Amino acid sequence: MLEAFARFTVRLHEQGICHEDFNQTNILWEYDGTAGNYRFQLIDINRMRFHARPLRPDECMINLRRLSCPAVPFLYILDRYADIRGWDINDTLLRGTFFRLLFGRRQQFKKRFRERKSAAAGKKQG
């Protein structure tokens, strides 16, 4: 399934399609036993952007960073993605991991900020 998902994502990016909220909750899939393949669909399509060119490598990695799957499947997807695109696998793994870590840190920072803001608002009311 991850191999098929990597191929699906490559096709999107090569066609200049970027889903700004590319995560598991916005990706539907089903296995077609007759054809022996997976089919994927995107939802929440109001967050999609269409470019007249394929996405640049950093744009692709930034788009993939939102996948909140465990590390091993994420790295496998990056590996297959790089192989399908003909990119250097180690470079793709490094870039993808870097952007994912930055995204995770940003999410943690935002969560802590909201918690502190809520705590401060609670003290003012009390």
What are these regions (language model features)?
Residues 22-27, 70, 74:
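Positively charged, low-complexity, intrinsically disordered RNA-binding extensions
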Residues 117-126:
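An acidic, Gly/Ser/Thr/Pro-rich helix-cap/linker signature
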Residues 1-20, 25:
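Conserved kinase catalytic-core helix
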Residues 21, 31, 49-51:
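Activation segment
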Residues 38-117:
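C-lobe/activation-segment region of protein kinase-like
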Residues 26-42:
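Conserved protein kinase catalytic/activation segment
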